[in-house]
Every structure is written in C-alpha cells, then in structure tokens.
C-alpha cells in the first residue's frame, strides 16, 4: 500500500514521500518539500473542481484559514489512481471546534460569514447553477412522500417505518408545502441569479470535522469536497439547525448567530424569509424516507428505524426555528 502512495506523490505531484502517518482524514505525508495530507475525497469530479476554484478565490480575498489544495503536475485539482480520486492539501489543525456551547457556534457563525463574504467574485466553470433547484426538490419530495403513502395504504399492512411515516405524514407534508411557498416569497430564483453573477457557493458540510481550531483560537475550515453552486444561506440554515441539535438552543442564541454572520454578509428581509423556508422544511426526515423506500427493502432495519425516529423528533424544531427567524424580520 505504501508503494501506491509513493507512486501517487511522485507521478501525480512530483514529490518524494519520505514518511506517511495515517489519520482519521487521510495520510499526513512528510515529503522533500514539507508536510501535506493526501486524502480520498467524497465528492464528484465537478465538486472537486469547484472546491479548487473556491479555495483559490477565498485565499485571493484574504480568507486563508483553509486547507490549500495543490494541483497535480498536469494542473488538475485531483489525481486518479486505479479509479480512485486523491487530493493533496495542507495539513489542518487536528483539534476540532467543540460544538457544546453557544459561544462556539457564535465563533462558527462569524467564520461562516467571513468565508461566504470572501467568495465574492468567484467564477468557476464547475459551478452549475439551477434557478429552481430547492423549490423543485421540495416539490419532488412531497410527491414522493404522497406516492409512498398511497402505496402503503393500498397494500393494507404496515411495518414499523410505515407507521412512523403515517404519524408524521400530515404535519410534514404541510410544512414542506409552506417551505416551498416561503422560498418563492423570498425570491429564491432571483437570489440564485444574483449569487451566480456576484460569486458564491454552499459548503454543504460546515460542521464537526470540517471545523478545526488552532491553539490560538483561530478556526480553520476543511472538507470542501461537497461544495456546490447553491445559496450560501443554505449553510447558515444547516448551522442553525446544528446549534439547536447540539446545545440548549435559544432565540437569543440564534439572534446572536445571525448578528455575527451579518457582520460580513448582511441579511436582507428576503434573506430572512428564505431562511424560514429552509429551516421549516423537514429535510433530513424526507431524505431518509426517500432513501429507505427506494431500497425496496424486504425487512425493517432497526438502525434505519432508529435514524428515522431520531430525525422525525429533530425536525420538530423546524416550526420553532421558523418562528424565531420570523420574529427577527
């Protein structure tokens, strides 16, 4: 296995691998030109190309607290070996940002605002903007949920997950429809067009392992391999959800997070309406339901049942989160 890494470093990047240490994120490599980390990214080739362009723009605009991605000898943002993609990046601090206090989330919200602001002017051929992606996704998930309900009712017998779906069907269908309407009222299509023109992106994994903290308190951001051409507000909505999940979330805490984020990316009244829609939509529950029924299962997995039950309870926060944001408009 070490021979493969030596080959990747030599033929892909022109570096001599002298020693490698495995970590939870990849292989930290000591080379003839210093330390770097070789990783197997999770994203597609398009998302990796976009991530490369995003990082370049962030650094150009002064946001340097990221893992710089190094191009291959052929100028590509990734190297392909035996069908597997690899990327080479700077080594990030090993300590993750503790997500157990309101103060940590305030720091995270401000860093998120700084990062989104630094993406202005981003232009990438790998960014594929879709003017109605989220509204269409919300409508699609509602349609899928209705089909599952009809199929279950026609069959006439219900397993544990069918019963769970039955319990949450009406309220979550109503919330998904309201969320779709809020995106329309908040001008989602216009916001996408504006972001595409001005430059921006959505990280899609701004949490946990992606947030590293140096001993001096600085926060570094990694895990860009899932970034996409989407409203940056989607990152903020996901981070607010996580704040409520990881702490005893309060309205005051959310207001403070919005204020910290807004120092760098001011939030308009229409932005707040879009946030309401994103927070109200039961994203995790509907995604897991779709995943489960698309597998054409023959038995009910206890693990999946637990995941769905936990997601259903977690999504109950959506109405409260929407009300908190509405109160700030």
Please describe what each predicted stretch is:
Residues 34-127:
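ATP-binding pocket architecture of kinase catalytic cores
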